[in-house]
């Protein structure tokens, strides 16, 4: 069994890959692309007898990376024999603060399980490439047994090749004075390009979680540029909003938050989001039976959830990173482990065919359940009242307006941007 590493700058050319041409990506790479790989691979021809580790001569392994220069017989380990097939996970924005928390959760087995080996494929930019090398070094020094491969690069057509999961965190932050329409266009270009790359080289059943904001519309752009991947496989992260809502309900009810279930965030990841207390439960009872303060539920609860990020910035001096990473891990775990009986989770998904009457062809956060196979179904046993529906329609209108802003990126003609008010969440300005 071989344990190897490659660290090789490569040159290539910048051009978008045509849709539907999966293996043409070799000709469509950014100029001066960089790719480095730290890999643990099975090589029966190089197995070491008796499980003894041996180092290869430096002269024959000039490109190796630290501990990955050493070879091991991994078949000598009983737990290795029972491991599942390796899962390839791409992470964009991999040199950022969110990724700095997330990657170690992934590598530890906390997210996919203690019998699931993984390969991490980290996407950055020329500007962040040295930082990516530092991230790879920290992962190396952490000695995670399930982490079998680490590669870093700036070309999505290389980094996304054969990935089973794509966690798209990287996006341009909103600068001072930048209109929301401009942010939609700038980040939309990023996610259009990444959608094309996923369509060209990723696994055709890849699961895609969009974190970079505005995440709902970015997810829509991404899926529209990846027609060979099921639209159902694309998600926009609203799990942090759900986690915040659970915390506030638990605080008000005087219980620990593990007693709170069936919390839904409906709509956009913006201040039009709708934390649903009508269907939520505390210790199995409807929230409205436990918390009888209707005014608090309708006003303070919703506003507190929407503005939690801003409150954190005031205290901490920067936007949330660790809690966002936790929510990404939670979102993945909700798809790879069966949903507890009677419960559900929130995620932004494609609305076409939804049972609620929400406009089709947008990405909208809704309640979902999973059997633990990476797929999901929409929960149907939900209640609606006028208060909830009115707010859902407001968030729907916002997403329809955003969709018009990016029509040039989704193949639907010329863009027309008329977002009536600025609803970006605190920390995104």
From Swiss-Prot:
Keywords: Chloroplast, Disulfide bond, NADP, Oxidoreductase, Plastid, Transit peptide. The active site is at residue 269. Its EC number is 1.1.1.82. Pfam families: Ldh_1_C, Ldh_1_N. One of its GO terms (cellular component) is chloroplast. Substrate binds at residues 174, 180, 213, 244. It comes from the Eukaryota. It catalyses: (S)-malate + NADP(+) = oxaloacetate + NADPH + H(+). PROSITE patterns: MDH. It is found in: Plastid, Chloroplast. Residues 1-40 form a transit peptide. NADP(+) binds at residues 93-99, 187, 194, 211-213. The record marks 64, 69 as: Activation of NADP-MDH. One of its GO terms (molecular function) is L-malate dehydrogenase (NADP+) activity. The keyword NADP applies. It is an enzyme of class 1 (oxidoreductase). One of its GO terms (biological process) is malate metabolic process. SUPFAM superfamilies: LDH C-terminal domain-like, NAD(P)-binding Rossmann-fold domains. Chloroplast NADP-MDH is activated upon illumination. In order to be enzymatically active, disulfide bridges on the protein must be reduced by thioredoxin which receives electrons from ferredoxin and the electron transport system of photosynthesis. Belongs to the LDH/MDH superfamily. MDH type 2 family. Homodimer. This is Malate dehydrogenase [NADP] 1, chloroplastic.
